[in-house]
Every structure is written in C-alpha cells, then in structure tokens.
Amino acid sequence: VEDPSAAFIHSCNSSPFKATLGEDNPDPKKYPAYLGIETFMTNRSRRARALFGTDPEISRQDFFDYKFDKEYDPASRLIGHIDRFLQEIEPENAEQKQAMELIRSWDRKTDLENRSTAMVTLTFRPRSQTGKMRYDKDRFPRQMKEAIQMLKQRHSRIDPTWGEVNRLVRGKVDLPLAGGHDVLRAI
C-alpha cells in the first residue's frame, strides 16, 4: 500500500488486506493461499481503523489519545467470547455470581480505576493476538474461579481497581499501569 486515498495506513499484526480503508488495500485474490497470509483482525487493528480511520482531522492530542487507546472493540473476539460465556455459564455460588456480574458490567476499557478489568483479564487471559483466541467452555470457568481466589488473597476483594492489580515494579518503583493485552495501549 502506497499513498492511500484515505491518508491512513497501519500495521497491528493483522490482515495486510485491511491495512488502510477502501479500494487501496491489496487484493487477497492476487495472493495464493500457500503463502499462508493470516487474515484475522486483532483488537488493536480494529481500534486503529475505528479511531484513526474515521477521523478526517486528527489533532496532535487526538493522535496521542488514539495511540494510547485502552478499549476493546465491540467486534473483537474477546468480546464475543465474553458474551457467549455469560450466556452459557451458570454461577455455582454467590462469589461466582458477583464475578460474572463484574464481567457483564465491564465497559471494555482498561483504565486504572476500572473495577471489572482484573476479573475479565484473569478469567479470559487475552494475549497479544486475541484474534486467535479460542472459546473454551471448561477453561474460562476454571480461570474465573482461580481469579476469584487470587484477587481475594492478594487484594481482599474480587473487584480491585485495574491499577491495583496491573503494576510496573522495578526496585523501589511501583506504579499502576492502564492498558492491557491487544489494546493500542498494549501492556
């Protein structure tokens, strides 16, 4: 892709056939399947396209806000797995019911003060390429139970803020970190 008419190009470890907007993307039909070109879309790619790709006038502040976006796209695979999990899994006790309510109420953001992000992250354990993440009806409930125990043990509650859980610790320096796996503010 060179000099696309959309004046927008990105690479977020996802489909090269969606590197820009519109007609300027490479045509997948021109590339044989044996090349093994992956076509999945990462959350970072979805968010970059949604933010940078739809804003006709990006200010300097917009650029930094978009670059450090801390949100999951509604169409990301992680959100699809969460929706399915909430439909299929029944809580076994009051703690699991509370954990599932945290997951249900999550706003898809990984801000420091968010009280649902830790439960979501520890239950689903998204990695850098959530586009490859597979739904696992046995693993996710088990990981939710582990998350409940770990959060209670380390934070005396199952809904600590994300900043209490996600930390950068180097020697005497101990700082909260916003962001997460496969968001533009990747951690």
Where are the predicted features?
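Acidic, low-complexity N-terminal propeptides/linkers enriched in Ser/Thr/Asp/Gly that mediate export
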Residues: V1, I9, R60-I187
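Catalytic nucleotidyl-transfer cores of nucleotide-processing enzymes
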Residues: V1-Q61, P74-R77, H81, F85-P91
